[in-house]
Amino acid sequence: MEPIKNLPRLCRTLGYEFTQIELLTQALTHRSAANKHNERLEFLGDSILSIVISDALYHQFPKATEGDLSRMRATLVRGDTLTIIAQEFKLGDYLYLGPGELKSGGFRRESILADAVEAIIGAIYLDSDLEVCRKLLLTWYAERLAEIQPGVSQKDAKTLLQEYLQGLKKPLPDYQVINIEGDAHDQTFTVECRIEDLSQSVIGVASSRRKAEQIAAAQVLELLKK
């Protein structure tokens, strides 16, 4: 397995220094690249993320129903949320992919990015313990936990952005597909989202146009709320 460059920089971004750096390397390794890949770490990280977020929501909302807690958790741990976190960490710059995945733009594919976040969580757990993972994840999720509320429909990002702009009597966002890569059965869509109040355009990349639009919309919402 080839060494992945700039791991110390990624550790600083994550807010965690690995004792066993090979665990981070494995977490960033897609199954297309090597036999020792990140799928088992992903399995572990998925469970850890679920228990940490469940515990946080349980204590943050003592009067919330089981249904509300489940819906809020689903919003926080679903793939598009993890993809946005991966993009915030610029994980695509560090992934180790096989030649086929690399050529088809796998470093931008939302499922690969989301899986890598879960694998990193699993790697951090093995390198430390559950309490360290809990504190780190609560840091990663601080803004999202502060914003989420029970009883509120967990609407998708495009709907939330549209309602936000309508409330301000602003023009609706404009979504444009600016690139499509890959074969017909395995395409990667790059979508640009533009709104009046942002001078820059925001890009979403995913395996479908709809998902790419959702990712771009979620990033625009975060920029508007800063």
From Swiss-Prot:
Active site feature: D46, E118
GO CC terms: cytoplasm
Location(s), subcellular: Cytoplasm
Enzyme class: hydrolase
EC code(s) of this entry: 3.1.26.3
Keyword Ribosomal protein: no
Assembly notes: Homodimer.
UniProt cross-references to HAMAP family, sorted A to Z: RNase_III
Function field: Digests double-stranded RNA. Involved in the processing of primary rRNA transcript to yield the immediate precursors to the large and small rRNAs (23S and 16S). Processes some mRNAs, and tRNAs when they are encoded in the rRNA operon. Processes pre-crRNA and tracrRNA of type II CRISPR loci if present in the organism.
Protein name in the entry: Ribonuclease 3
Gene: rnc
